[in-house]
Amino acid sequence: MEVRTSFSKARRIPEAVSTLINEEFVVVHQQTEDSSGKDAKPQLKVFSNGDDQLEKAMEEILRDSEKDQNNSTALPEGSSDACSQASGLGSGGQTNQPSLQLVLDPSTTEVSARRSSSPSEPLEEDSVLFNKLTYLGSMKVSAPRNEPEALRAMANMKSSSQAPLSVTLYVPNVPEGSVRIIDQSSNVEIASFPIYKVLFCVRGQNGTSESDCFAFTESSCGTEEFQIHVFSCEIKEAVSRILYSFSTAFKRSSKQASDHVKDFVLHTPDSDVYTFSVSLEVKEDDGKGNFSPVPKDRDKLYFKLKQGIEKKVVITVQQLSNKELAIERCFGMLLSPGRNVKNSDMHLLDMESMGKSSDGKAYVITGIWNPNAPMFLVLNEETPKDKRVYMTVAVDMVVTEVVEPVRFLLETVVRVYPANERFWYFSRKTFTETFYMKLKQSEGKSHTSAGDPIYEVASLQRESAREEQLLSPTSGGGPVSSQEDEAEEESDNELSSGTGDVSKDCPEKILYSWGELLGRWHNNLVVRPNGLSTLVKRGVPEALRAEVWQLLAGCHDNEAMLDKYRILITMDSAQENVITRDIHRTFPAHDYFKDTEGDGQESLYKICKAYSVYDEDIGYCQGQSFLAAVLLLHMPEEQAFCVFVKIMYDYGLRDLYRNNFEDLHCKFFQLEKLMQEQLPDLYSHFSDLNLEAHMYASQWFLTLFTAKFPLCMVFHIIDLLLCEGMNIIFHVALALLKTSKEDLLQADFEGALKFFRVQLPKRYRAEENARRLMEQACNIKVPTKKLKKYEREYQTMRESQLQQEDPMDRYKFICL
């Protein structure tokens, strides 16, 4: 695979495009016979965690490459903002090294990057070039973003291709660039089309003959006719790198598209959309009677704050488009640590000033921020190394023509340093966000005293959210799903529970299969129909989960439990305070559970309270609220309670809480024995670190993975649990450990725990990644006989331990 690039800037592979989300880039040095240690070239080794390290490493490579003239190998991810050199990946090099290497050599790159001067040759744009590809052809498709249809087309093209062509694929680095397919033998262009016409990318599934293939669809003739182009790679591992280049191009293209959207809004005089630019600045007391703007990191643009120093927050609001709206005043400025903050958690700042700017074009609000106040403790403690925290600031603006105050809310990243810290290198660039406000005529009061119409806010959207919509396949804007910003990708912030949207779209063929199966099932509710397990393993369609989950749990005839629930919610519970505390921390990232005393929290409270009264032995235990919340997202609270009780009793979840968690510890023992058998190297590494299963898997078992993982993954796990039983937890746990093995083998004790807590859940925000994980989990063998054997071993071990303990403890164990 030869790869050449005229320029590119390394970025993380988006989750929705590439499956190699565990890749991370670190620099390693390799000694050669001709070079000393100090002249050795850095190389690029692929793993997973940080653009900063990558860019610094790449800059070092570019500097060193000017001194060294050896032949080189290359990876598509080059990095240099101003560099016009290119890199080539040859077939040479040591075949026994698993790591990918990148060495840029001027003697070869200048030739490969040089633009063609021959009129007979196509002009090379700023592109990444991929050789050793075979073009299997193209065909028309009716659903350009349908993965099953794309995979079928890929399989058909792979099996029926009679005369595949060796081609070079050009993927542009610029938003106005074009994807080009060139015949290698004749250098003739086979096809060319702008990058924005590419709608969807897909790779062949592992374990199939198409595992070395990839394909993309493009709109060839307007919006009603689409083509899919299919390729195979001589080097299978190159598929992910090709998709990486596409994802980078999509990012740039979508950015340009969002600019076009903004231009359209700006130039539509009759539009009901009003555009605002809102900027944020934080100032600190400089000790000389003045307040100076705090510095921002040059690369990531996070604010650098100092501990204990009085601050001022300055927000500037400027209208950019449409008829000018009259801002009367700022109703309030609010601030809080964190992001996705509930309204009740925002704190009002004292206002120092508000009014129009000196040029009259903007409205400026200044608030006084005392960082020593208890509610701002998180923003006044020194931030640990390599970690940042979020801060949310909002202003409520009173606009003459709008009925209610308009809230502009900004979320940014900060780091807190000691009060005596000095900053040498920083950026003065302003933190700015663009908002699009859509108004509609008010049905109440129709005009102001001046005769202007009165409006209501129909929607208020940030530009960053618009860009995510442009990238979302469900919105028709592009080939990759919504991405968290780079700061979130690299931060140490844990993923909020309840994160992620789950699409209700489902191919007609799958819905037909489920419809036929449900028809048979309703004819005989006592017996599960044939083919059920196969369909469930692929995931129950979101639109059908309420019905299917109740059928799987056996809640089709549960009038007695429904009546009992209505009585239980009227009874008092001794655990009401604990329940109230927990529901505020359950799925804060989900709109349904965000608001204090909202419908979501109210229903969740009633289910947890009812169960605490119903189950007198166990009552309510911390973590149960997450499972109840998952059920509430699919069905009314009465039905959710019935399914919840079934899972606790019939599926045995409540057993994990009994007898001082004895059964839970047995599960940990079984998991470690399975690791010892299936992942011996990881088991040995954990043993060396004294890292035990209870340290990372407690939440997996007690909450059924519902507490920290994205909803697309959580819902699929509940599908499998209700169909296959509690043992599915072992399947999912082993799949997580297998897919993360390389990262965990390199981690120390603290690093491994942090990986389980922070990085691991973030990997499955994309539905495709979660689907692949569930597919792997279903393929893992966990024999019931083996689990029974491990359970007996655990009982024997516990009996031996108790022989050494107090006789009363031993008696209690025997009575379990």
UniProtKB/Swiss-Prot annotation:
One of its GO terms (biological process) is endocytosis. The keyword Protein transport applies. The record marks 581 as: Arginine finger. Residues 31-42, 53-69 have a biased composition (Basic and acidic residues). Keywords: Endocytosis, Endosome, Golgi apparatus, GTPase activation, Protein transport, Transport. Residues 483-493 have a biased composition (Acidic residues). PROSITE patterns: PID, TBC_RABGAP. Pfam families: DUF3694 (PF12473), RabGAP-TBC (PF00566). It is found in: Early endosome; Golgi apparatus. Residues 125-281 form the PID domain. Residues 81-100 have a biased composition (Polar residues). Residues 110-121 have a biased composition (Low complexity). Its main location: other. The record marks 622 as: Glutamine finger. The keyword Transport applies. GO terms for molecular function: GTPase activator activity; small GTPase binding. Interacts with ANK2. The arginine and glutamine fingers are critical for the GTPase-activating mechanism, they pull out Rab's 'switch 2' glutamine and insert in Rab's active site. PANTHER family: RAB GTPASE-ACTIVATING PROTEIN 1-LIKE. GTP-hydrolysis activating protein (GAP) for small GTPase RAB22A, converting active RAB22A-GTP to the inactive form RAB22A-GDP. Plays a role in endocytosis and intracellular protein transport. Recruited by ANK2 to phosphatidylinositol 3-phosphate (PI3P)-positive early endosomes, where it inactivates RAB22A, and promotes polarized trafficking to the leading edge of the migrating cells. Part of the ANK2/RABGAP1L complex which is required for the polarized recycling of fibronectin receptor ITGA5 ITGB1 to the plasma membrane that enables continuous directional cell migration. This is Rab GTPase-activating protein 1-like. It comes from Gallus gallus.
